[in-house]
């Protein structure tokens, strides 16, 4: 695991747990905006890129993140953001409560399956094969993720997809298998730790059906969590393709408490 730090001069801290299957540079613009206000710690998971190590599990990742934060003297976080696999990691991080978080955004976070083992294994096999097909075929990659939608304005889609295709080929078979098994089968305590964190769960309007079980899980596990639908967005689209809108929305949530305090005056 690697940790990229930005805005280190700020006192306020924000943990940034990205989704899988995207290189660290896919989040540069959004992280850059957040670093105007926060000391941002962006996690790069094992097995993502040429790290020389395989991704093991959500549990291992959360332990490593916790150890890194504690080793660097961070005993409390002002904010945390996790998307997809990162949302799974953030869900467990919050549930354990070893490092309190004031406000957290779980963006389309994956939650544990609640179905028989055989069905979970079949789902993992489906996801594993789907990833391998996308990583192997440029045509499939561009069909599933059309460049005209998934390339930011002003950037060269050919160069970006060349880089993305090369990046996806760095994932080992073990990493891919572990990602899809662990993201959907990680363990949680029966009840989450009580630490007063304000949690919101984001999901794109165009992925609502796909996130249905995740939304139900979050509502049950974190009863006080707010739900926030992002209009006209698909999975992880806001944070990667619309950094200014992402920044506006996340800062509106992260600064709610301060705004209310200022109004009370």
At which residue positions do the language-model features occur?
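Gly/Ala-rich beta-loop-alpha elbow adjacent to hydrolase catalytic centers
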Residues: 82-90
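Conserved alpha/beta-hydrolase catalytic His-Asp/Glu region
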Residues: 115-117, 136-193
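Catalytic histidine-centered segment of alpha/beta-hydrolase-like enzymes
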Residues: 233-245
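Active-site loop/oxyanion-hole signature of alpha/beta-hydrolase fold enzymes
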Residues: 41-81
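Flexible "cap/lid" loop of the alpha/beta hydrolase fold
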Residues: 95, 101-133
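Acidic catalytic loop of the alpha/beta-hydrolase fold
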Residues: 205-210
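Short beta-strand/loop motif that positions the catalytic acidic residue
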Residues: 195, 201-203
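Conserved HGGG/HGGXW glycine-rich cap/lid loop of the alpha/beta-hydrolase fold
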Residues: 4-50
């Amino acid at each position: 695991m690697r940790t990229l730090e930005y805005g280190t001069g700020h006192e306020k801290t924000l943990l940034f747990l990205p989704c899988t299957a995207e290189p660290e540079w896919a989040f540069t613009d959004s992280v850059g905006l957040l670093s105007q206000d926060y000391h941002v710690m962006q996690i790069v998971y094992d097995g993502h890129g040429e790290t020389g190590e395989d991704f093991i599990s959500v549990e291992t990742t959360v332990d490593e993140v916790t150890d890194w934060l504690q080793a660097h003297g961070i005993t409390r976080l002002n904010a945390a953001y996790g998307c997809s696999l990162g949302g799974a990691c953030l869900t467990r991080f919050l549930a354990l409560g070893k490092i309190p978080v004031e406000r957290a955004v779980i963006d389309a976070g994956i939650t544990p399956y609640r179905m028989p083992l055989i069905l979970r294994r079949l789902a993992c096999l489906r996801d594993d094969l789907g990833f391998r097909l996308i990583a192997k075929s440029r045509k499939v990659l561009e069909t599933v993720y059309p460049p005209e939608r998934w390339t930011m304005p002003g950037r060269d889609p050919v160069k970006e997809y060349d880089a993305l295709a090369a990046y996806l080929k760095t994932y080992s078979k073990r990493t891919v298998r572990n990602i899809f098994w662990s993201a959907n089968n990680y363990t949680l305590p029966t009840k989450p730790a009580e630490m007063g964190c304000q949690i919101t769960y984001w999901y794109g309007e165009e992925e609502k059906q796909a996130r249905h079980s995740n939304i139900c899980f979050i509502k049950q596990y974190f009863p006080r969590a707010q739900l926030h639908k992002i209009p006209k967005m698909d999975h992880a689209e806001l944070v990667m393709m619309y950094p200014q809108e992402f920044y506006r929305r996340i800062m509106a949530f992260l600064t709610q408490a301060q705004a209310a305090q200022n109004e009370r005056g």
